[in-house]
């Protein structure tokens, strides 16, 4: 994760994003990897997640849906730094991020990617939980944060279809940033729909072209951890290119 971030510091898209964040300014709350400067929590989360994702080299989990769970780690790092959490708490936050993201990748048949949605649609439901926990939110506040983010950040699959732009590697980081924003809003008393999954016009009802196995989301939670099943890339390229690259190298 951190290695991917440092390796991406000279990317043009990263430079553009960093300049954008510098122009915005704000309170110095969390550190930007590589630069060492500090920005407010959402902005630091965004640029750090962009750094992790920029080279397309970070980890991958692909079952019914694909995902890059390490995109969410910057939400843990920024809020953890701000709240002065110790290493144990940061590790717990990372494990929670992986567990929830990967369970969502298992729960839809077919995956949401198969019906035209990007996996950031799943990340938007995970990032507020992780950020909320690190910020010390109670259960009611975390539910509100999920509702805030989960009702407002569905992402079209078009970001990875056809001619690719910088949004290919930015869609998930934006969902991570938004999760931190949602948690911060909730901490101030802001509310969101509490049944964003199962309620009227919620996730399960609106995405009715897939069948959701709700038990996958909670069954055996805490007994074992999916983070151990996440994969790593051999090349800094899109996952589906790895087979032809390997074949070419062996010819």
Q: What is each stretch, according to the model?
A:
Residues 1-227:
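N-terminal core-entry segment
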Residues 220-251:
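A conserved active-site cap/scaffold subdomain adjacent to cofactor or substrate pockets
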């Amino acid at each position: 994760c951190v290695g991917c971030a440092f390796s991406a510091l000279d990317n043009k898209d990263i430079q553009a994003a960093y300049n954008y964040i510098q122009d915005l300014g704000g309170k110095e709350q969390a550190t930007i990897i590589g630069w060492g400067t500090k920005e407010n929590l959402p902005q630091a989360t965004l640029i750090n997640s962009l750094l992790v994702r920029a080279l397309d080299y970070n980890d991958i989990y692909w079952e019914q849906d694909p995902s890059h769970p390490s995109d969410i780690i910057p939400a843990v790092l920024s809020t953890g730094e701000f709240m002065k959490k110790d290493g144990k708490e940061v590790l717990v936050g990372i494990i929670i991020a992986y567990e929830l993201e990967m369970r969502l990748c298992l729960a839809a048949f077919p995956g949401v990617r198969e019906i035209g949605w990007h996996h950031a649609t799943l990340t938007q439901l995970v990032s507020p939980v992780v950020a909320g926990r690190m910020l010390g939110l109670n259960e009611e506040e975390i539910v509100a944060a999920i509702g805030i983010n989960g009702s407002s950040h569905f992402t079209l699959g078009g970001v990875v279809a056809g001619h690719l732009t910088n949004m290919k590697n930015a869609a998930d980081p934006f969902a991570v940033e938004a999760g931190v924003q949602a948690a911060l809003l909730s901490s101030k008393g802001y509310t969101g729909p509490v049944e964003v999954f199962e309620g009227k016009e919620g996730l399960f009802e609106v995405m009715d072209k897939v069948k959701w196995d709700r038990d996958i989301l909670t069954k055996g939670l805490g007994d074992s951890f999916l983070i151990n099943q996440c994969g790593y890339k051999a090349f800094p390229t899109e996952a589906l290119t790895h087979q032809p690259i390997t074949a070419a190298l062996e010819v």
